[in-house]
C-alpha cells in the first residue's frame, strides 16, 4: 500500500543559543522538510495523565552548497562566529523559560529535532532504535509528509537488518542500568526513585525497547502505539505499580530474547545501502531542481 502525502505544518520554533538551533539551521530544516512525526511516549501510547512533553522528529533535504560544497551554519545564535556542519536542527521550547538550556522538559513542552536526510540515513542504517521509529509512525501521528517522505516510509524495509539487534540491546542495557542505579548510571528524576525505589520511566523504556526490538527482529516492523496488553503493562511500570524485581525479570527476559535473535533473526545481515544511496541522490537532485 502506498502511503499518502500529508500537507501539515513545517514551522519550527525560532533559533536559540544551542549549537544546533541557529536560524540558518532552522531555515534549512523548514525548507527541505520531507517528514515530520510525533515520537516519544505520545506515539508509543505510554504517556500518563498529561505528564509528558511532545517529542517530534523530522527529516530534511539540504541545499546543494551543504552537500557538494563546504557551507556550514552558525553555532547557535549567540554571535560567537563559530560554524559547524549542518546535521540537524534541535529545539526545546522549555529553553524559552527562565533557566534556559538548564530547564527540564515537562508537560506541554515541545522537543523537536529535524535531521538532515544524510545523517538520519546513517543512523537508521546502523539500526538506531530512536530514528527508526520515524518510518513506522501511523498516519494520525504524522505532522507532515511530502512525496519524498512517502517514498522513504514505503521503503522502510530497506533500513531493517540484523544490525538493529545490537543497537536495541545496547539501548536496553543503558536504560536498565539507569533504572537500577548501577555504577555510572544517572537519573534526572530522583523523585521517582524516592517514591518507587527505582526510576520507573527508565524501567518502562528499557522494557519497551526489548518488546519493540523483538518485534522488529521477528517481523521487520514496529507497531505503534505498542499493542495491548503490553501497552497497559508498560504504563503500570511507569506508574510504579510493578515491583522492581518483577520489572528487572521482565527486562532481562526481553534482553535474553534479543540476544538469541541477534544471530538468528531471519532479517538480512545488512540493510539495503545501495537503495538508500540512490534515494538520497535522486531526492536531493529533485529538490535542487524544483
Region locations from a protein language model:
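Short, amphipathic C-terminal "tail helix"
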Residues: 273-290
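Amphipathic alpha-helical interaction segments
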Residues: 128, 176-179, 287
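Residue-identity detector for glutamine
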Residues: 5, 24, 38, 51, ...
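An N-terminal structural lobe/cap that precedes and organizes the functional/catalytic core
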Residues: 2-137
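Histidine (H) residue identity feature
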Residues: 18-20, 44, 49, 92, ...
Amino acid at each position: 500500500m502506498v502511503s499518502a502525502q500529508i500537507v501539515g505544518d513545517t514551522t519550527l520554533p525560532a533559533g536559540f543559543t544551542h549549537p544546533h538551533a541557529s536560524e540558518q539551521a532552522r531555515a534549512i530544516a523548514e525548507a527541505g522538510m520531507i517528514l515530520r512525526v510525533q515520537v516519544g511516549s505520545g506515539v508509543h501510547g505510554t504517556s500518563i495523565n498529561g505528564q509528558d512533553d511532545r517529542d517530534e522528529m523530522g527529516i530534511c533535504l539540504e541545499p546543494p552548497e551543504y552537500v557538494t560544497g563546504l557551507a556550514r551554519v552558525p553555532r547557535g545564535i549567540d554571535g560567537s562566529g563559530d560554524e559547524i556542519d549542518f546535521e540537524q536542527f534541535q529545539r526545546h521550547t522549555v529553553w524559552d523559560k527562565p533557566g534556559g538550556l538548564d530547564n527540564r522538559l515537562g508537560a506541554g513542552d515541545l522537543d523537536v529535532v529535524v535531521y538532515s536526510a544524510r545523517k538520519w540515513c546513517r543512523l537508521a542504517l546502523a539500526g538506531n532504535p530512536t530514528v527508526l521509529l520515524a518510518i513506522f509512525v501511523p498516519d494520525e501521528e504524522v505532522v507532515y509528509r511530502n512525496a519524498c517522505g512517502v517514498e522513504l516510509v514505503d521503503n522502510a524495509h530497506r533500513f531493517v537488518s540484523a544490525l538493529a539487534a545490537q543497537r536495541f540491546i545496547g539501548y536496553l542495557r543503558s536504560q536498565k542500568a539507569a533504572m537500577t542505579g548501577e555504577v555510572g548510571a544517572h537519573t534526572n528524576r530522583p523523585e521517582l526513585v524516592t517514591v518507587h525505589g527505582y526510576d520507573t520511566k527508565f524501567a518502562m523504556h528499557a522494557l519497551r525497547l526489548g518488546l519493540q526490538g523483538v518485534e522488529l527482529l521477528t517481523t521487520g516492523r514496529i507497531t505503534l502505539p505498542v499493542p495491548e496488553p503490553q501497552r497497559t503493562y508498560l504504563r503500570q511500570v511507569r506508574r510504579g505499580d510493578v515491583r522492581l524485581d518483577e520489572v528487572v525479570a521482565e527486562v532481562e527476559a526481553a534482553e535474553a530474547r534479543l540476544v538469541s535473535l541477534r544471530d538468528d533473526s531471519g532479517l538480512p545481515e545488512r540493510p539495503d545501502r545501495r537503495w538508500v544511496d540512490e534515494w538520497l541522490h535522486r531526492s536531493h537532485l529533485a529538490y535542487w531542481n524544483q
